[in-house]
Amino acid sequence: MTASPDYLVVLFGITAGATGAKLGSDEKELILLLWKVVDLANKKVGQLHEVLVRPDQLELTEDCKEETKIDAENLSSAPQLDQALRQFNQSVSNELNIGVGTSFCLCTDGQLHVRQILHPEASKKNVLLPECFYSFFDLRKEFKKCCPGSPDLDKLDVAAMAESLNFEKNDSMSRYGASQVEDMGNIILAMISEPYNHRFSDPERVNYKFESGTCSKTELIDGNTVVRARGLPWQSSDQDIARFFKGLNIAKGGAALCLNAQGRRNGEALVRFVSEEHRDLALQRHKHHMGTRYIEVYKATGEDFLKIAGGTSNEVAQFLSKENQVIVRMRGLPFTATAEEVVAFFGQHCPITGGKEGILFVTYPDGRPTGDAFVLFACEEYAQNALRKHKDLLGKRYIELFRSTAAEVQQVLNRFSSAPLIPLPTAPIIPVLPQQFVPPTNVRDCVRLRGLPYAATIEDILDFLGEFSTDIRTHGVHMVLNHQGRPSGDAFIQMKSTDRAFMAAQKYHKKTMKDRYVEVFQCSAEEMNFVLMGGTLNRNGLSPPPCLSPPSYTFPAPAAVIPTEAAIYQPSLLLNPRALQPSTAYYPAGTQLFMNYTAYYPSPPGSPNSLGYFPTAANLSSVPPQPGTVVRMQGLAYNTGVKEILNFFQGYQYATEDGLVHANDQARTVPKEWVCI
């Protein structure tokens, strides 16, 4: 609770575009600013003032011209925004004769005039707003406090407030803007008089700057306060995001840049605001611009934010405990680099905060350095000096430098500290069989489609290939998804022969599918496997995924001991057990395998996946085929799981991995089941 100001300055802004509830949502510039002073102590209203503002783009919508009676000729000689704000400040100071102890505060019809017009536009034009624009009274909220029985805030405007107070409709001033300011002055006088006696004591606040900070994974976050911003420039920082959302209050540490599977920024960020109201205002900035790029803004959840920004490391929390620091990320450090060498690298012109204490090296779980580090600088000047050393040499390696954020520190540390190394399992009794339909071979009997529409389905691909669709192997369509599970625009098709793959590539290369031309290349199953696991395939050849697990493990000859897991089988089934082949990869049934780095792109239902944990083609012969019968079940309940299927076949010998539940294109279970007995 703060003291009530002596004066209120009623403020109203008009842009070259939308009005009312859509004000500011179209990113149009301010063209007219109107204001009037209300003396709360003496209950008097001053004169109406207005100033035209010349926008950079002299283009007005037809609705704006009709509402305001302003055209481009009127604006051509008007002052620009910074000059108009100086006129406003000077006029208010002269009228109030501001001295020691005199206070005033802005009052607007809703949040849009200050948060969605003045602050964003001033930020884009590098105009410094006066102090008075960082606090204001929302007349709608104050009226709701004064008259609880009035309509809801989303339905409350100047006309509704005047109607609730039984004011006569003002037809003397029909010009848009002036009539609203006149009515707002009268509404304020009515609110501070009998019988309401309302006090304006708790204004809205606009944050001066974004505050960085940490977020715990156990923190409770309101899911209605988070948005996802997409299309950011790769070099953007959390300060750039805060500037894009200028006027809206972002929670401390609430700007989290997202990283892709390779640890690089993917152009997305999750932003957490202080309230749902600010989140809703942020959604109105959908497709507003950051420089020359438009930014998409969508709703997100608290869980999404915690996945990116949440962390539990005490080391990170201690590193980020120093507030108001600029973070710089170093990449490509020699693995033997020390803190003293990093301090010497930046030198005296950009001293690191706290010396060696301001450096955080990133390591793998076993303590090996990754070549990444984060460094703290006390001010923007030091950080800019540091960034000028981008690609300077440290030892014999050039070092990449980027502005970073607290959330990026959490993500990088979480990624490297939580990725488990591949465990060396003990010799098991159950073999993991490779997929028989995707042998890693150099026979070029596959085709790759690149540039597919993101909405393309398997049926669209079959239609695109026309006569060659009959030459596709069973389950031979593999759609490549990105790390977020969305289509990447690539697909691999397994053909029945190399000739058909060659002819399909020749005939359909650069043919169109849904107004997009599609590139078609002939390739091998091995190349397909590399891409499905996160590698890249281009004109320069294959670039393997970040970490491939070894193709096989070799175990020593097992002793003649029956494992404890075999106790579930009948004794007759354990006679003459088959000897294990030491050259083949075997894993226990419950063993969980990990890649050192998550870069696997899953295929949709119906397109089987191929991982590098299995033996190569040369090792396939070492696993003798196991006889069995496939049983198809129909009429299953939609929520039936593998456990229920195995219970149904209790008493028969089968492996748990022999159950295959079918799913449709929307990844929902369909009532079919295949079991190998």
From Swiss-Prot:
Question: Biological process (GO) annotations?
Answer: alternative mRNA splicing, via spliceosome; branching involved in salivary gland morphogenesis; epithelial cell proliferation; epithelial tube branching involved in lung morphogenesis; positive regulation of epithelial cell proliferation; regulation of inner ear auditory receptor cell fate specification; regulation of RNA splicing
Designated name of the protein? Epithelial splicing regulatory protein 1
> Which terms does the record give in the GO molecular function aspect?
mRNA binding
Modification type Phosphoserine: residues: S543
Q: Which InterPro entries match?
A: ESRP, Nucleotide-bd_a/b_plait_sf, RBD_domain_sf, RNaseH-like_sf, RNaseH_sf, RRM_dom
Q: Which CDD domains match?
A: RRM2_ESRP1, RRM3_ESRP1_ESRP2
Q: In UniProt terms, what function does this protein have?
A: mRNA splicing factor that regulates the formation of epithelial cell-specific isoforms. Specifically regulates the expression of FGFR2-IIIb, an epithelial cell-specific isoform of FGFR2. Also regulates the splicing of CD44, CTNND1, ENAH, 3 transcripts that undergo changes in splicing during the epithelial-to-mesenchymal transition (EMT). Acts by directly binding specific sequences in mRNAs. Binds the GU-rich sequence motifs in the ISE/ISS-3, a cis-element regulatory region present in the mRNA of FGFR2.
UniProt GO cellular component terms: nucleoplasm; nucleus; ribonucleoprotein complex
Principal subcellular localization: nucleus
Give the location in the cell: Nucleus
Report the family membership. Belongs to the ESRP family.
Modified residue Omega-N-methylarginine is at which positions? R578
**Which key words tag this protein in UniProt?**
Methylation, mRNA processing, mRNA splicing, Nucleus, Phosphoprotein, Repeat, RNA-binding
Q: Which domain of life is it from?
A: Eukaryota
What range(s) does the RRM domain occupy?
225-302, 326-406, 445-525
